[in-house]
């Protein structure tokens, strides 16, 4: 089967499968309980900075000593004790928040030069908050288990429960942040991860003492997988409205594929008609439709094909090509992969202490199954809105994979009353996007000219968006 046909089969039919190498041996967890042992002091290529950062493992509990999740934590650049704590999650499922979020989007050190250099990110989100990046679930990045059966039980529910266990134990390492305002943010399939983790924290907080609770205030998700039916309809309509697919392809898909709830789209006619959709994206980047694709080598003009991570249901594969703002290079996914496979880097980050039997990969090659993935996050979002959490949903408007149309359709399905009508918002002298506020405080924000990974293509605008979110301040309505 040709690669594009496999991709199409995956998004329409198959359950979660991520092709890659299978672990050949068990590993033993070694995880310090002292944060001082996780302090990073000699990261290769790191520019000088005036803040501390930590990396290492956290065991998931006395009954789960075989499982440990890997983290990288950056203190805020100023007044860290008075700044909020923000957990960032990437999607997939199976993609690393460190290889993508930290190293290619919003962390303070961005990987360049084929993994040989780190550059300082002037728009890092740790300018505004203490930033915690987590590789979850086990099997992602450096996170691991010594029980191979754990890899057969992965899904949304396990990811949420393991992430909660991680946080509880992480706060034991970093008790000074236990009372900090806590937010969760992420993109793509983190449209599942983030609300689900927020819900288990919210529910747990009702059962424990204040001293044991997590001071959850809200979450922000970008280009997020939210609701299967509307996400899929928006995917097709976006391609048509942006002149990527023809009228004929658009009409044939709508005529043969159902975009109603609880449908599977497994018909042969739907599959065949979707081939035209796939063909249209063969030579452009679906995650950022107006930027160049990565070429496989300097000697070849053939586009470098993205790694395809097949995820549950229709909308959840996510290869997450990165897009850096200055000196744009669409090949930096491989740069991050090369960097984190370096032994000196792993030693500096206290990573891979058990010598995993497979190389580091930005998207996991060992997760073969994904057991559960609800078709919609809308009930959870509505529950947490009612519970008083601050929720912002943003969308880079040049992403074709989880496009702005999908997000608009999903929010419309929530049936919320508009409180502040659609308006432009500004970054300095330019329109940065548009914003609309709904009952309960839900903000929907677009980011003009940004693709799937908003912090990478619109770094200054994303930092403005982030700072206003955590401050609960309306986005600028005038030039400044």
From Swiss-Prot:
InterPro entries: AB_hydrolase_fold, Peptidase_S10, Ser_caboxypep_his_AS, Ser_caboxypep_ser_AS. Glycans are attached at residues 79, 146, 265, 352. It comes from Arabidopsis thaliana. One of its GO terms (biological process) is proteolysis. The gene is SCPL35. Keywords: Carboxypeptidase, Disulfide bond, Glycoprotein, Hydrolase, Protease, Secreted, Signal. This is Serine carboxypeptidase-like 35. Probable carboxypeptidase. The keyword Glycoprotein applies. Expressed in seedlings, flowers and siliques. The active site is at residues 188, 399, 452.
